[in-house]
Amino acid sequence: MLRPQVALIAAILTTSSLYAQSADHYTAVSNTAMSVTGDVWLDDFGMTFENEEALEFSDLVADHFLVDNRSLPGSVYRVKVPADPELQNGNQLCGSGDVAYVANWDAGNGLTAIAVFTGKRPPKSSDEMCALYTYQE
């Protein structure tokens, strides 16, 4: 009787592990990233955190983003089901509401910046973020 349930659980765990393996891996380098998210796996479909919590994206809403008043190539994704997941050390991704958008851009020197946003409208600039994390590509 438990065999089908065990098989289903195993399939779900294998699928989430395979997803993380197919996405690009980013190593946490900023103090904030190391203490909140740990390493992350990111692609056009979602973001998985070191503790295996994840955010799924519904669509790409912008391919450029204002950072320090400069337009940079980057990606702004809408989160399919906004959430503020509990990550490492009991910390939350944003801490001030559900994350509805995630943006990432090249921060130079082999680094990637990932910012998270609350709100109903897509963010226009980094000034609107609730948290910023930096990773090594």
Where are these regions (language model features)?
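N-terminal glycine/threonine-rich, aromatic-flanked beta-hairpin/loop signature
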Residues: 37-76, 114-132
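Short, solvent-exposed loop/hinge segments that bridge or flank secondary-structure elements
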Residues: 22-24, 28-56, 80-103
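Sec/Tat signal peptide C-region and signal peptidase I cleavage site
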Residues: 16-20
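Hydrophobic helical h-region of N-terminal Sec-dependent signal peptides
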Residues: 8-14
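Bacterial N-terminal signal peptides that target proteins for export
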Residues: 1-7
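Beta-strand-rich cores of mature extracytoplasmic or soluble domains
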Residues: 78-137
